[in-house]
């Protein structure tokens, strides 16, 4: 078996993801898929970067086919969990196993910078993506 070639890029060279729809929970987010199957041939890994301006959010969602980690590099807001919302701030490191609800809401007046990744999938399509059915809301924790 021949190993794949290493991949290298720079954040400023990776375009913002287009086509992420608000009706699917992507609210005013600036998302970059830095490493994945589409550019690095990584079939089981995605690494990304997201900027959430004030008021932006990634609504509660889940991935049935991958685990996710999230590092809050700067800013603060609230994370969504299976049971509600919790405060989050710079330095938080969050692990969400596949099949669990999660998301992030920038409730502050400054940008939030997130570094995140998926293990077990090389693309959004492979990760799977589900949002709650209308009216399926959780109780606040």
Q: Could you say what each language-model-derived stretch is?
A:
Residues 1-44, 59, 129-141:
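A short, N-terminal "cap"/entry segment at the start of jelly-roll beta-barrel domains
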Residues 31-33, 47-51, 69, 85, ...:
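Conserved hydrophobic/aromatic beta-strand scaffold that supports enzyme active sites
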Residues 36, 74, 119:
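Cofactor-binding loop segments of dinucleotide-utilizing enzymes, especially the Rossmann-like FAD-
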Residues 39-40, 65, 109-110:
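Short strand-connecting beta-turns/loops that link adjacent beta-strands
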Residues 45-47, 57, 76, 113:
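Intrinsic-disorder/low-complexity, polar/charged segments enriched in Ser/Thr/Lys/Arg/Asp/Glu/Gln
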Residues 57, 63-90, 100:
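A short beta-strand-loop-beta hairpin characteristic of the jelly-roll/cupin
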Residues 78, 85, 89-90, 98-124:
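Ligand-binding loop in jelly-roll beta-barrel domains
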């Amino acid at each position: 078996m021949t190993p794949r070639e290493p991949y290298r890029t720079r954040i400023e060279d990776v375009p913002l993801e287009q086509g992420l729809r608000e009706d699917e929970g992507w609210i005013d987010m600036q998302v970059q898929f830095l490493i994945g199957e589409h550019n690095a041939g990584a079939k089981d890994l995605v690494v990304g970067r997201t900027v959430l301006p004030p008021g932006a959010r990634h609504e509660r969602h889940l991935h049935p086919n991958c685990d996710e980690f999230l590092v809050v590099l700067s800013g603060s807001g609230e994370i969504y969990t299976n049971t509600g919302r919790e405060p989050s701030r710079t330095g938080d490191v969050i692990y969400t196993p596949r099949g669990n609800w999660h998301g992030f809401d920038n409730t502050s007046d400054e940008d939030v910078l997130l570094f995140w990744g998926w293990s077990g999938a090389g693309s959004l399509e492979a990760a799977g993506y589900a949002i709650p059915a209308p009216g399926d809301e959780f109780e606040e924790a």
